[in-house]
UniProtKB/Swiss-Prot annotation:
It holds the Pfam family Phage_GPA. Keywords: DNA replication, Endonuclease, Hydrolase, Nuclease. GO terms for molecular function: endonuclease activity. Its EC number is 3.1.-.-. This is Probable replication endonuclease from prophage-like region. GO terms for biological process: DNA replication. It comes from Escherichia coli O6:H1 (strain CFT073 / ATCC 700928 / UPEC). Belongs to the phage GPA family. Possible endonuclease which induces a single-strand cut and initiates DNA replication. It is an enzyme of class 3 (hydrolase). InterPro entries: Replication_gene_A-like. The active site is at Y498, Y502.
Amino acid sequence: MSHDDMSNSSGFNEAAASFSWNGPKKAINPYLDPAEVAPESALSNLITLYAADNEQEQLRREALSEQVWERYFFNESRDPVQREMEQDKLISRAKLAHEQQRFNPDMVILADVNAQPSHISKPLMQRIEYFSSLGRPKAYSRYLRETIKPCLERLEHIRDSQLSTSFRFMASHEGLDGLLILPEMSQEQVKRLSTLVAAHMSMCLDAACGDLYATDDVKPEEIRKTWERVAAETLRLDVIPPAFEQLRRKRNRRKPVPYELIPGSLARMLCADWWYRKLWKMRCEWREEQLRAVCLVSKKASPYVSYEAVMHKREQRRKSLEFFRSHELVNEDGDTLDMEDVVNASSSNPAHRRNEMMACVKGLELIAEMRGDCAVFYTITCPSRFHSTLNNGRPNPTWTNATVRQSSDYLVGMFAAFRKAMHKAGLRWYGVRVAEPHHDGTVHWHLLCFMRKKDRRAITALLCKFAIREDREELGNNTGPRFKSELINPRKGTPTSYIAKYISKNIDGRGLAGEISKETGKSLRDNAEYVNAWASLHRVQQFRFFGIPGRQAYRELRLLAGQAARQQGDKKAGAPVLDNPRLDAILAAADAGCFATYIMKQGGVLVPRKYHLIRTAYEINEEPTAYGDHGIRIYGIWSPIAEGKICTHAVKWKMVRKAVDVQEAVADQGACAPWTRGNNCPLAENLNQQAKDKSADGDTRTDITRMDDKELHDYLHSMSKKERRELAARLRLVKPKRRKDYKQRITDHQRQQLVYELKSRGFDGSEKEVDLLLRGGSIPSGAGLRIFYRNQRLQEDDKWRNLY
């Protein structure tokens, strides 16, 4: 800058400073001079809060948008680049696993086990982990190759046999692909699937009808052709349509076609509830056969039937009891009967069922003594191709994927062929047959038969011939594994004593708590629950009498005798009830409970049914079922030597739900009682409060804590029955105190067995659970049950058992 410029600028500054309005202004800086900042107002604070809320909402929307974008666009199924990267990772991982499997074939078996459904893979992996924890690599590898691998191969064969070609074709329809995984489904899933199947059948019916019903002149044969179309679809699902035998085409039909059965049959095939029952039964059977294929039903795992099936049976029984307790029977006159009492008084009660069967066997024994017949005890077993598991828990190499039902059908067919040959040879017998399961669920029979002494050898030889004729080469000279016979010696025991144990252990195990099964190693009373679950699941008839009159007429006669006794009132006991003396003698024998007299008065043993004097009468039910048809029910009794029928079910009872009395529920403090501060207290507090109330009312109890032994003894013996009951009720509420240091002592081997059994039942088998059981605690196992460890055994209590 030149000198002239500097002089000019200085002159300008001096001129500007001479005027106040032209002076420099101070810069605005709120951080340096806060005193001049405008004060905050309520409006400014509100604006600030709104701005912060808007900022938070904007951040939330951006985060949500990123989540939606990542979920639906930036994933392996949407983004091609990421999908390709994930596929490369999976391919490299599969190549690595394949290379490892080339050097270690055991990993292939483990991968196959993990690929199975949970009801198969979980118990198998628990067993594999147990063998792996033993620290014996060779035994672990041998177990995988010799036990697990054959089990998986058998499982695939079972699945192929279950899923027939027609069944797979039905699963190819839209919405019915769940049929392929039917054993893996739960009840809710089966219900949804049954609805879809019923809808498919409805569409098949619409397609079959077409324009058939456009006119009124439809012939019955055309309707039957429509039924055949729907029935063919039902048969593809391996389900027999209702009334199939009566309505199917036959070459030599002797009777006219019952066209009246078509509406009820079609209504069932179009009903979702009917399909649910069929599919659920099929699901349970298929699932059980798959568990048998992998050796999970045996003496080493769960005898007779799987543990899952036992738990399902317990839950079903609990629901049935709740249903019986919540309903009652009402007749036209307004009389009511408690449904639980009616069920317990019928033959559904295991105790009554056992007593009736023992009385019948005793009657056969008395008749045999009177006739001079001998008694023989037979045992018949299926060939080895029906047995899935060996006694050591390993797969049976000769098993041909035969099911439990097929083993039962084999014995039924063999017995029918033998009976035909026996009658052709002029031989006769009578007795009772008991069906029992082996440890793997395969059926075998025990027979108590009475026959003439001169026919015993011929009948035994003929029965042995039919029992061992299939797969004869596997027996050699020893036919004992397939057929056994024992002549009952009266010196050792009566025929009733021989069969008593088999009847009891297949019903409720009464009187067999101390006996241990040689096949399973468990108490026969505990095995009874498993046997009942086995018979219910596979629909096996456990008991069958032959050669004697029917027992249903015996029950109807006893019912008639009870009704007559109530109507006679003050008349002389033993007065005749029926006009015909022969029929009245049969009724008197049934009323007295003497099966021997009842059988002989009916005509005796080995008499055809058409010659029995009293038979059961049936009638068509007046009220239609849910499917529009009328079923058949028991009417009473009838006799060919007397006119008319005698009704034993004249009163019509209707099942209704019980009405809940709120005041009574509050007094009983049951489940229906309203939740108040009174019934919500623990039992001990309620007891103490009741004691205080009674003390306030003047009811003073003697303090027994200050008495010595003699005074306490005299006081307890001087109490009335009511006071004793009250004291016993109070003592039940006092829980016994267990020592803090209490713990059962077991060996390491017993601890490993306990852990293994806990894992087999679906528990973790951790140290915490083991210590809890050893200290006397219990673990809930479902359906109101708890497991505990006592006497070196893992036991399970059942609070419903004493009701059955």
